[in-house]
Design a protein with these regions (language model features):
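Well-ordered beta-strand positions in beta-sheet-rich domains
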Residues: 11-13
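A short, charged, amphipathic alpha-helix used as a generic interaction element across diverse proteins
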Residues: 15-37
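Short aromatic-glycine-(Arg/Gly/Cys) micro-motifs in beta-strand/loop hairpins
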Residues: 1-9
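Short, mixed-charge low-complexity intrinsically disordered segments
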Residues: 30-87
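Generic structural motif
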Residues: 8, 17, 81-83
Length: 87
């Protein structure tokens, strides 16, 4: 599994989806995001979301969300290794 926050982090590869989501959530929590965004990402990528996220990756090839730092959006992506995420 690969996770990245475009413009902030390089793609990081993990053997297991739970590890990837945990690392992504830690990276998001380190950013100066508003409380609403942090709560959204906590819910979206929490440990209980592994099955749901995995299903979406199988169905759609990736999962995307947006993180806003000020007025600047950054795409947050989770996708399978070997699958180049669409830009």
């Amino acid at each position: 599994m690969v996770v990245e926050i475009k413009g902030i982090t390089e793609p990081a590869q993990f053997a297991k989806l739970p590890d990837a989501l945990s690392a992504l959530l830690a990276s998001l929590r380190a950013l100066p995001l508003g409380i609403e965004q942090l709560e959204y990402f906590d819910e979206l990528f929490d440990p209980g979301s592994v099955q749901r996220i995995g299903h979406r990756i199988v169905a759609y090839g990736e999962v995307r969300a947006l993180a806003f730092l000020g007025l600047t959006p950054h795409v947050v992506k989770v996708y399978t290794a070997g699958h180049e995420a669409p830009r």
